[in-house]
Curated annotation (Swiss-Prot):
Belongs to the Smg family. This is Protein Smg homolog. It comes from Idiomarina loihiensis (strain ATCC BAA-735 / DSM 15497 / L2-TR). It holds the Pfam family DUF494.
Length: 157
């Protein structure tokens, strides 16, 4: 499923190509690209849920906790997000790339993925996908894109 999300992001969203709106046409294209129908449906449902989280008009769980509260991860979240990934999320919050709400959306989307070996690089892509879908987060998206694609120049000290 994550491979399909990456394919869609790289070929449609990140490349700024016109997004195919027709669900059946998109499914057919992904099938021709070699993806299985069941995985395609899961990936499209994942994207629909991401869009739903961004467009909620009612109070959500994101509005319940105080903005300055400390995030306590569940056992399942700690299994999926290793200490390096959790530290990276905190780093992004400290930089201002993520705020309380976007961090929670990222965690929600990570937990719904069926990727057995979720890595820090996978997390970075999920963050980028989430930020792309949040209105008003263009600067955070650009900053995250820079973090994802920047090449280290010279030795790190």
């Amino acid at each position: 499923m994550f491979d399909i999300l990456m394919y869609l992001f790289e070929n449609y969203i990140h490349s700024e190509m016109e997004v195919v709106v027709d669900h059946d046409e998109l499914t057919n294209e992904l099938t021709r690209a070699g993806f299985r129908h069941q995985e395609i449906q899961k990936a499209l449902a994942w994207l629909e849920r991401l869009a739903d989280l961004q467009q909620m008009e009612t109070k959500s769980y994101l509005d319940v906790a105080p903005q300055q509260s400390t995030r306590i991860y569940t056992a399942a979240e700690m299994t999926r997000l290793d200490s390096q990934s959790r530290g990276f999320l905190m780093y992004l919050e400290n930089l201002g790339v993520l705020d309380f709400a976007t961090r929670e959306v990222v965690i929600d989307r990570v937990m719904e993925l069926e990727t057995p070996n979720f890595t820090l690089d996978d997390l970075k892509w999920v963050v980028l996908m989430v930020l792309f879908n949040v209105p008003g987060q263009e600067a955070a998206y650009d900053q995250m894109e820079g973090l994802l694609f920047e090449e280290a120049e010279g030795p790190l000290h």
